[in-house]
Amino acid sequence: MTENTHAGRLIVLTGPTAVGKGTVEAKLRADHPEVWVSVSATTRAPRPGEVDGVNYWFLTEDEFLAREAAGEFLETAVVHGMAHYGTLLKPVEEHLAAGVPTILEIDLQGARRVKQRAAELDLEVVYVFIAPPSFEELERRLIGRGTETAEQQARRLETAKVELAAESEFDVTIVNETVDQAAADLWSVIAKEYGL
């Protein structure tokens, strides 16, 4: 085991599809610009308004698989049976070493892979689960988003049931009643872990 060069604990943020993870982390970043949120790589097509390098690193499947084979990812997963997602390791390590509050917003598969690799990489991690007030509210949010077909929505809701059942695997649960409250709760976790 190598000497720990990380000055802070990595915050892994997970929750079911359409729970508002991205909205909560955007509010957190607006209120606390000192927080760095890792930009995931993906092979899925950009949604309207998404920008390469800001929302995701949009890669072809060949590019993604080559970087995965080169060991450049902390974790990777195939999500909803459709697209590859992954977290590039080097930027995470650099931000942690600099003491910058660092968040990974990833799905359940990714969080489980980080758990598997954390000891090997000498990472200290806090796992945070963002939960909806109810399954019905989650369904309403997903349908209201209007970015998926009915078939994709049904597949995502089935995945969400599995994700919700895994809540007990996490250190902290934050219920996303409102974005402001959930972002404030997440900041409380970060402030505690980073001594802010």
From Swiss-Prot:
SUPFAM superfamilies: P-loop containing nucleoside triphosphate hydrolases. Residues 8-191 form the Guanylate kinase-like domain. Gene3D superfamilies: Guanylate Kinase phosphate binding domain, P-loop containing nucleotide triphosphate hydrolases. CDD domains: GMPK. Its EC number is 2.7.4.8. Its main location: cytoplasm. It catalyses: GMP + ATP = GDP + ADP. ATP binds at G15, P16, T17, A18, V19, G20, K21, G22. It is found in: Cytoplasm. GO terms for cellular component: cytosol. HAMAP family: Guanylate_kinase. Belongs to the guanylate kinase family. This is Guanylate kinase. It comes from Bifidobacterium longum (strain NCC 2705). The gene is gmk.
